């Protein structure tokens, strides 16, 4: 009897995997970043901008990680600002700056500085031996609360092994690709505060694994302490600069009217802003490629020296007394203070992120006038968070960008209209709101101005943390620049009370393709029509070297005019100079193998995602839709294949099979370009626009009936 009682009282081993492995249909709250009209976005996994996985946006909550005992050593978030301080901007055709724009720049600069200090202080709240992780922390700087060493599946807990068994994945495949499995788990379990690391093969006993794990935790803790010390030194130095230094006059033209204007300087030159935090700004007359970023010029005795930052096609003529030193992917050139170089904080499995310090992938690096003191990066750094390669950039146009956070004020002034209460500009429409994990989208009507009584989509985005501010401004800038019939039209953006950004876009009354799939069955010719329209948008993006990186059915919309458009550019990246990135971001079911394998990826990731979307449209659901772990692991190891022997695909045409096969190539170099896919025989079977217009009433009726049915079920 005593054994029975003790058995009943025994706590069941917790299984955190059930929190993130469910499909989006079963657990909407797991999405990290909602699209305009639907949930289901993820960003992260051991890397990336917001590297980390299923992180729902719960308001005002914090997560507590115990750092004492039972592997709960370490933990906490580390705030690591960028140090590049030279950015470039394109100005309006006007040569004067309005007084309101100037005052806004000044106000934004002061506010952003105080905001960064606020975030920095609120992100690490340590009481005793416990870290409290605020949900608003920048997850780029994630330091795990628990590190688990895994060499084979036997090293997982009992409940985790049971969960893996339920996925029906061959044991040999799991053990042979344990690194891919750990990548998947790190991507999905980031919010749980857990980091899985692969144990070296020479560590075979528990003692060795424990020692290895302790070494990793110590490295993480030392890294955290070093970064905090560097932060303090950096802030002290900036404080000295505020009280000393010669300020130059700033002449920058700011576009705040929200129209889709691609501003260019009259003479084709770009102004270089140096140390925008301290208002110490130097400019030159040479043509500057903004993507060629230089290191921070934190020198108390700058005395208005001209520092020319050029690309390969520009002449660099420096007559200053400072020595010239070239930054490389393995060296950071420092000034007379111990700076927080981006690569010092962010070195990881690849040197790609160091390209930000060397001016992209041009091979020559950025040439700066700096002191000769250099700090070499470790060739074998400890486990550290990895960011997307453009983590400190705000897009201007392909190949040109602002440096973040130093030039955040200029980007904000150019992209966003400051409005104390933007709600007075709109009235709410019938479809009041659609909530996403990172924002709420409303159907609204403008009450005056150019778009009076025009229904638009209004997306409210939180704008408090540093990461959110960068992502919001980058998404706005990209969408503002893009102009294509198959990309949703950007209208304007407003800042409310320094806490929210309201982004206004065209309203798509037909909803997302994902909504349509859940209520309606498409035949192949309509699938081909939608695919053709999306290929046109991808062809346009490829011509600009921009990868969307979150292509999925809930980011494709249709309207009553049979127009199909791509939305949500939050994970998009300009690859003009970077060429490739290493970053697990996007949505689990649509992620390409190279991303899952944590390898460099480029424009071809969108072709893989398109193949999954096409399969979803004809089948009604994505492959392995019940489990994110299984879907990602199999995609990253054996790929996705479709067979005519299956019941659901026995009626598919040969053209469809071939289209899916070429899109879902494991090797990204073998995937065709959007232009090549537009010539594929499957696209030739597409319905006409007139035929699609005839289909829309049935589609909308099915959607309405489904909404009414859900409403009755919720009562």
Swiss-Prot record:
It catalyses: L-seryl-[protein] + ATP = O-phospho-L-seryl-[protein] + ADP + H(+); L-threonyl-[protein] + ATP = O-phospho-L-threonyl-[protein] + ADP + H(+). Residues 42-53 have a biased composition (Gly residues). One of its GO terms (molecular function) is ATP binding. It holds the Pfam family Pkinase. One of its GO terms (cellular component) is cytoplasm. This is Probable serine/threonine-protein kinase mkcE. Belongs to the protein kinase superfamily. STE Ser/Thr protein kinase family. STE20 subfamily. Residues 54-70, 80-125, 367-378 have a biased composition (Low complexity). Residues 207-241 form a coiled coil. Its cofactor is Mg(2+). Keywords: ATP-binding, Coiled coil, Kinase, Magnesium, Metal-binding, Nucleotide-binding, Repeat, Serine/threonine-protein kinase, Transferase. Residues 1-125, 228-330, 366-385 are annotated as: Disordered. It is an enzyme of class 2 (transferase). InterPro entries: Kinase-like_dom_sf, PAK3-like, Prot_kinase_dom, Ser-Thr/Tyr_kinase_cat_dom, Ser/Thr_kinase_AS. Residues 427-683 form the Protein kinase domain. ATP binds at residues 433-441, 459. The active site is at 550 (proton acceptor).
């Amino acid at each position: 009897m005593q054994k029975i009682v003790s058995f009943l009282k025994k706590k069941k081993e917790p299984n955190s995997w059930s929190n993130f492995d469910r499909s989006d249909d079963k657990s909407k709250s797991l999405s990290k970043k909602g699209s305009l009209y639907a949930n289901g976005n993820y960003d992260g996994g051991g890397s990336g901008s917001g590297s980390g996985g299923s992180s729902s946006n719960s308001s005002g909550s914090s997560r507590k990680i115990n750092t004492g005992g039972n592997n709960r050593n370490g933990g906490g978030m580390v705030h690591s600002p960028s140090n590049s301080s030279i950015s470039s901007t394109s100005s309006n055709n006007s040569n004067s700056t309005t007084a309101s724009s100037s005052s806004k720049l000044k106000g934004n600069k002061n506010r952003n500085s105080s905001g960064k200090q606020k975030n920095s202080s609120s992100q690490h709240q340590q009481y005793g031996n416990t870290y409290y992780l605020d949900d608003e922390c920048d997850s780029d700087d994630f330091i795990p609360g628990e590190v688990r060493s895994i060499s084979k599946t036997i090293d997982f807990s009992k409940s985790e092994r049971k969960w893996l068994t339920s996925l029906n994945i061959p044991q040999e495949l799991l053990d042979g690709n344990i690194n891919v499995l750990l990548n998947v788990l790190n991507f999905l379990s980031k919010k749980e505060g857990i980091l899985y690391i692969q144990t070296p093969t020479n560590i075979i006993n528990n003692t060795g694994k424990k020692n290895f794990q302790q070494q990793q935790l110590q490295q993480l803790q030392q890294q955290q302490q070093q970064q905090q010390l560097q932060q303090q030194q950096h802030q002290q130095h900036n404080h000295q600069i505020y009280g000393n230094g010669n300020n130059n006059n700033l002449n920058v033209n700011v576009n705040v009217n929200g129209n889709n204007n691609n501003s260019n300087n009259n003479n084709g030159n770009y102004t270089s802003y140096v140390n925008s935090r301290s208002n110490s700004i130097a400019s030159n007359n040479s043509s500057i490629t903004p993507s060629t970023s230089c290191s921070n010029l934190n020198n108390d005795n700058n005395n208005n020296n001209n520092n020319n930052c050029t690309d390969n096609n520009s002449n660099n003529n420096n007559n200053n007394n400072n020595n010239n030193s070239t930054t490389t992917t393995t060296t950071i050139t420092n000034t007379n203070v111990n700076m927080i170089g981006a690569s010092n904080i962010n070195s990881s499995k690849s040197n790609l992120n160091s390209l930000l310090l060397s001016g992209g992938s041009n091979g020559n690096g950025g040439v700066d006038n700096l002191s000769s003191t250099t700090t070499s990066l470790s060739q074998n750094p400890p486990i550290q968070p990895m960011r997307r390669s453009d983590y400190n950039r705000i897009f201007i146009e392909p190949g040109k960008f602002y440096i973040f956070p130093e030039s955040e004020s200029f980007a904000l002034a150019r992209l966003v209209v400051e409005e104390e209460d933007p709600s007075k500009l709109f009235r709410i429409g019938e479809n009041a709101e659609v909530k996403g994990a990172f924002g709420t989208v409303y159907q609204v009507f403008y009450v005056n101005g150019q778009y009076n009584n025009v229904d638009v989509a209004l997306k409210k985005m939180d704008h408090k943390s540093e990461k959110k501010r960068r992502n919001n401004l980058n998404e706005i800038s990209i969408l503002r620049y893009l102009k294509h019939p198959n990309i949703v039209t950007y209208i304007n953006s407003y800042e409310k009370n320094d806490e929210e950004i309201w982004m206004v876009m065209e309203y798509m009354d037909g909803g997302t393709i994902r909504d349509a799939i859940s209520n309606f069955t498409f035949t192949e010719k309509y699938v081909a029509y939608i695919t053709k329209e999306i290929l046109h948008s991808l062809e346009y993006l490829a011509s600009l070297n921009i990868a969307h990186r979150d292509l999925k059915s809930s980011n494709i919309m249709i309207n009553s005019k049979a127009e199909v458009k791509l939305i949500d550019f939050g994970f998009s990246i300009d690859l003009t100079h970077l060429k490739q990135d290493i970053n697990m971001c996007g949505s689990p079911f649509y992620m390409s193998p190279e991303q899952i394998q944590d390898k460099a990826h480029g424009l071809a990731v969108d072709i893989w995602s398109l193949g999954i979307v096409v399969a979803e449209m004809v089948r009604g659901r994505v492959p392995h839709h019940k489990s994110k772990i299984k879907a990602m692991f199999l995609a990253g190891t054996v790929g996705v294949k479709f067979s005519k022997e299956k019941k659901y695909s026995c009626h598919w045409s040969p053209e469809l099979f071939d289209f899916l096969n070429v899109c879902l190539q494991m090797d990204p170099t073998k995937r065709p370009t959007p232009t090549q896919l537009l010539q594929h025989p499957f696209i030739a079977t597409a319905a006409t626009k007139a035929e699609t217009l005839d289909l829309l009433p049935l589609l909308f009726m099915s959607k309405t009936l489904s909404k009414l049915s859900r409403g009755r079920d919720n009562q």
